[in-house]
Amino acid sequence: MNAVTDKSVADYIVADMALAGWGRRELAIAETEMPGLMAIRDEYAASQPLKGARIAGSLHMTIQTGVLIETLVALGAEVRWASCNIFSTQDHAAAAIAATGTPVFAIKGETLEEYWQYTHKIFEWPEGRHANMILDDGGDATLLLHLGARAEQDISVLAKPGSEEERVLFAAIKETLGRDPKWYSTRLAQIKGVTEETTTGVHRLYQMSQKGELAFAAINVNDSVTKSKFDNLYGCRESLVDGIKRATDVMVAGKIAVVAGYGDVGKGCAQALVALRAQVWVTEIDPICALQAAMEGFKVVTMEEAAAHADIFVTATGNYHVITRQHMEAMKDQAIVCNIGHFDNEIDVAGLENCQWEEIKPQVDHVIFPDGKRIILLAKGRLVNLGCATGHPSFVMSSSFANQTIAQIELFTRNEAYTTGQVYVLPKHLDEKVARLHLKKLGVKLSTLSKQQADYIGVPVEGPFKPDHYRY
């Protein structure tokens, strides 16, 4: 891997700075499709609410993320950035942001060792300063500081890695502690809070909070309605098949496609596949989600039942070993297997290590079993839409990232209102604000309640219009 570091600046690592011009042109296009972020820039640029914020960002380094980064900077923040996935970086986006002077450490196809090196670098600020905010996706940046601080007190927490990724992470922490025995606790003490982007990271935060281990306040961005019901659903509805088709050129129509998990992400995936006239089967553990899938006309089965019959498999659960080695051994020759959940362990990729691997092209592999049968594994079990394509469209990411920006402002400027160790969601009026910022772009014209109508249903004329417990 030929990473590029500018010797005069030496505070970024990207694949090729010559790609910066291309990245800048795509950023300009993305800005026209991200009205929420651009409106927030206009609203807050003068007041600079993030002045003094030093944000350590760990989120897919895409063009859309570039617009987020430049919005945070426009509002006064200083930012250091790494990707939260080894395959999700768009190298031209990383170069374009690095060219502006914002430190970026991200390369598409980086190794696990490089991944954790780069995640450490977002906490290595010059002149003895430290990050005071985290913007996270999947929770790795948050995990790094907490686990490292625990290891300072008890190195045995690093004794038994449960996966290759943990082995690399634990080694990186040990190496860092060898240089500075207080590296993690020093930085952890400076953090005011974290805003977390995705389901998996939010799950981690709630676990840490319940155990009394979370060292700062957190805002759960994922469960804002304008994130989970848009990014997770509509974003995946477009980006899943983009990734599958770029990787394989497969004809989806007529195929049997299995979607594991029928949450918001799984719903979007199922809608996309059925729109291309696949026969969609769903696997579920939750009776409510299973009933929803059945009522939409999908066949709900077990993975054991589906394995031998389907042509395309998509995991969307956020769980562990949803597709096992045994399942894959039962699959058809040339079955396509991919994941759209955050981590790579939804598919038991580690269980395939003793199979023969044949790279077809980057992020597309034949896995050949002893009997000669092959499956096509996409993105090595990591996010297919970002590993094999470019992720969600700009418009839907504007909604997600508007939530992230507002959450950063909330947590930084009103930190005393958020209790250390607790996880919060943004209030309803801010969720509705994010939605409003995107209506004009789609030509939407809202109706307005009269005072009498508002009184009749017991809401303010200007909203919020739904109670917090309302399920959209």
Swiss-Prot record:
Q: Which residues bind substrate?
A: T62, D137, E197, K227, D231
Cofactor, free-text remark = Binds 1 NAD(+) per subunit.
Quick one: where is this thing mainly located? cytoplasm
Q: Which GO terms describe its biological process?
A: L-homocysteine biosynthetic process; one-carbon metabolic process; S-adenosylmethionine cycle
- What pathway annotation does it carry? Amino-acid biosynthesis; L-homocysteine biosynthesis; L-homocysteine from S-adenosyl-L-homocysteine: step 1/1
Swiss-Prot/TrEMBL cofactor(s): NAD(+)
Localization, UniProt: Cytoplasm
Spell out the reaction equation it catalyses.
S-adenosyl-L-homocysteine + H2O = L-homocysteine + adenosine
* UniProt keyword annotations, A-Z: Cytoplasm, Hydrolase, NAD, One-carbon metabolism
| An example Gene Ontology molecular-function term | adenosylhomocysteinase activity
* Positions contributing to NAD(+) binding: 198-200, 232, 261-266, 284, 319, 340-342, 385
Q: Which GO terms describe its cellular component?
A: cytosol
**Mind telling me which SUPFAM superfamilies this protein's record contains?**
Formate/glycerate dehydrogenase catalytic domain-like (SSF52283), NAD(P)-binding Rossmann-fold domains (SSF51735)
Enzyme superclass (EC)? hydrolase
| EC number(s) per entry | 3.13.2.1
Protein family: Belongs to the adenosylhomocysteinase family.
Explain the purpose of this protein: May play a key role in the regulation of the intracellular concentration of adenosylhomocysteine.
Q: What is this protein identified as?
A: Adenosylhomocysteinase
Source species, please? Bordetella pertussis (strain Tohama I / ATCC BAA-589 / NCTC 13251)
